A protein has these predicted regions:
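Polynucleotide-recognition surfaces of large bacterial nucleic-acid defense/processing enzymes
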Residues: 1-127, 132-143, 223-374
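Short, surface-exposed beta-strand/loop "edge" segments at domain boundaries and coil↔beta transitions
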Residues: 104-109, 152-155, 406-408
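Glycine- and acidic
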Residues: 126-131, 139-141, 162-175, 205-219, ...
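C-terminal low-complexity, acidic/polar tails when present
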Residues: 126-140, 154, 458, 462-466, ...
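Basic, amphipathic alpha-helical recognition segments used for DNA target recognition
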Residues: 137, 149-211, 218-221, 225-234
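Terminal accessory regions of large proteins
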Residues: 276, 285-289, 297-476
Length: 476
């Protein structure tokens, strides 16, 4: 009887891998011994030594995703710098169109803030040496797009109608089933796990997606689709509160309001929507486990590589240090109050929200964390300050007649006028501003800090400039 021995080393950095390979004690815990007979007769000759049972059976007996959808390569421009730009600089130019560019880990909806110099049927790219126009006839019938970089896992989102997809954000045409069911399957931890059994590469090709095993019945299942649809809706709502997104929609209340309550309300919306999305994502995983007929051993193998669903974590927050969490939160958020997608400290698949990240970091229930952050919000000084600065940024742009990145025109106003208008908006402005900003005045914040907040939020391509005591909104 012959056996094969494998050492499973999946740590992210080369340095960690080297340390493990040089340490006999650490290496022995990663040894996987497999009978050679397991690989005899495998239909695709793959050495999936790490999986057996239900997972191995899924690769043999399940339908392939390519039977139900067509993952496709996107167009290559040949000159990214000349042909791709942010949408707020090109919104009124008819030669430019919205594009799915990839851009990192992003599930369900989003990454719609880029544009491509397209013209008629890609005429500008066609004329560029080194470019490659692909699947032009599929643009108007393609409903999904994904990020081709799979470092954090597979992430798929809705493609907007008529949106161009390029090589870093390839498209998926649905042939059979419900689009939200497709999204639910592809954005699951299980799909990422299965994909990693097919390829160790960090770049996800269309061919590997097509080879994914899939429980066919779920792709047309109404309840499964509803879970995916709910995730899209909640992610879209979250995107609509972030100013750099084309989905941004901000309605100011009439009359005066409380600045303290406004900040708390914005934080609560983001946390509540994320918590609800995590619940639906957990339901998706549960339905897939049942559909694939995975047993406890299969689930443990999957979770050892992808981590558990954040919603399933049950740890409490009894010993949490608010100041420590507050400092972590500040590092995890952009100047615009958006979470920076990343792999959490104790997870091996990327996450998209603050609650999910903190849940993995502290092995705590996201429900407990949500309650901690909202009920003890006054203790989270840095957290509130990020949201205050984001709110002030929105107020300034709104006063300059900015409504969204696709709905704005050039304008200007004096700092004095802006300061007066903002102060009049909130009944408790002086007290809350001083509490979070210290001795800095609003005039000083606009002069010294707002430019940095704006530049960072708008990805280094600002439309707001300061000239002396005047703020300008312009495309130049």
């Amino acid at each position: 009887r012959h056996v094969c021995k494998f050492y499973r080393v999946l740590d992210p950095s080369a340095e960690l891998k080297q340390n493990i390979l040089l340490d006999t004690g650490k290496l022995s815990g990663r040894l996987v011994t497999v009978p050679q007979s397991r690989f005899i007769g495998t239909h695709d000759n793959a050495l999936r030594y790490f999986v057996n049972g239900g997972v191995s059976r899924a690769f043999v007996k399940s339908k392939k995703y390519g039977d139900f959808a067509l993952p496709m390569q996107g167009t290559s421009t040949g000159d990214h710098k000349s042909f791709i730009d942010v949408v707020w600089r090109r919104a009124h130019d008819k030669d430019w169109r919205s594009v799915s560019k990839g851009g990192g880990y992003c599930k369900w909806a989003g990454l719609n803030h880029f544009a491509i110099r397209w013209g008629k049927n890609g005429e500008f790219i066609r004329a560029n040496p080194g470019s490659a126009l692909r699947n032009l006839d599929k643009i108007y019938v393609t409903e999904l797009a994904y990020s081709d970089t799979g470092t954090n896992g597979l992430s798929v989102r809705l493609l907007q109608p008529g949106q161009v997809f390029v090589s870093s954000g390839p498209g998926i045409k649905i042939l059979y089933g419900r689009k939200f069911s497709h999204l639910a399957f592809l954005n699951s931890k299980i799909a990422t796990f299965l994909l990693r059994q097919l390829t160790p590469k960090l770049t996800i090709s269309a061919g590997y997606l097509a080879r994914l095993p899939v429980p066919a019945a779920l792709l047309s299942d109404k309840r499964f689709a509803e879970c995916g649809k709910n995730c899209v809706s909640l992610k879209t709502k979250a995107n609509s509160r972030k100013i750099k997104n084309p989905e941004f929609h901000w309605v100011q209340r009439t009359g005066r309001s409380s600045l303290r309550m406004t900040i708390a309300g914005e934080i609560a919306k983001d946390l509540d929507d994320e918590l609800e999305r995590l619940k639906h994502e957990a339901q998706i995983e549960e339905m897939l486990v049942r559909a694939f007929r995975f047993d406890r051993a299969d689930v443990e193998a999957i979770e050892s590589e992808t981590g558990r669903c954040a919603y399933a974590l049950t740890g409490t927050a009894n010993s949490f240090d608010s100041a420590h969490i507050d400092a972590k939160i500040r590092r995890k958020l952009t100047a615009g109050g958006e979470y920076k997608p990343r792999k959490p400290e104790n997870g091996s698949v990327g996450c998209e929200g603050l609650l999910e990240d903190l849940a993995f970091t502290y092995s705590a229930s996201p429900r407990v964390l949500r309650n901690l952050l909202t009920k003890q919000l006054p203790e989270f000084h840095e957290f509130r300050r990020v949201y205050l600065e984001d709110l002030l940024h929105k107020e300034v742009l709104h006063l300059l007649c900015f409504r969204s990145v696709t709905k704005w025109s050039s304008g200007q106003a004096s700092i004095g006028k802006i300061v007066s208008a903002i102060r009049q908006r909130y009944t408790d402005f002086p007290a809350v501003f001083k509490e979070l900003m210290g001795s800095t005045t609003l005039e000083e914040w606009i002069t010294n800090k707002l430019p940095d907040v704006h530049i960072n939020t708008f990805l280094g391509k600002p439309i707001l400039t300061l000239d002396g005591a005047t703020l300008h909104l312009s495309r130049s």
